[in-house]
Amino acid sequence: MPYFDIDNGRLHYRRLGFGPALLLAFHGYGETADVFTVFEPHLQDKYTILSINLPHHGLSEWPKDTYLQPHHLSTLVAQAATLHGVARISLMGYSIGARVCLALLKAAPDKIDTVLLMAADGLSINPWYYFVTRTLIGRLLFRSFLAFPAASLQLASLLRRAHMISTSYYMLTTQVLQHNATREQLRLAWPCLSRLVYRPEYLRAVISRHSVKLLLFMGSRDRVLPPRLGRNFTNGLNSAHFFVLEKGHRIFDAANAAQIAKHLLQ
């Protein structure tokens, strides 16, 4: 099976297509590299897609309690470019995978051609995520939240009834807390990716300075990452193109993959 060896970890990837240009793709939380197969028929002539399994997802092997750091992403880009024999690459990311793309863009901006992001995380700093992954009190509360799922579900229900969290967040919380495997994945994956958070003004400056083509798709019915985040992020960026699709957070599927892919082919 194909892997990129990154320090003490191994990131598994799936190869899709056979085109001359290289596209690295990063899936959303709780998914695998297989999610991007819907794009293969539309991109395979122009791109070879290396769809990466994030740490603690799919067949990737990553040490527990080890952060995915910016220098790991630089190593990944260098290995992928050498493997494919190219000097520059493009990126595609969905949800938390979009945050990885933005961090990769920050780590190696001179190596990036086009960035396609869908239902993108990382367009703003989420104070709750920062609190539970970057502060001592937050980390302790996060571990307690996962250690006592029954009590945490009751708390989440109260917060939803008090309109302190949305129904979408409540449903996500319920899905995660119901099973040991999903709780363990969250315990490992959320902190692992917490070092890939940057201020949006800094990311915008990198995109502007290097004239990186940014294609950003957000869902009009997305309650997790609403389209206003994308509108605010792209405002004033000359190389950015912003699109709103009539979708929720699951913004792409076999029905609209061609519509999204055509913008990478232009």
PLM regions and their residue ranges:
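Short beta-strand/loop motif that positions the catalytic acidic residue
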Residues: 210, 216-218, 222
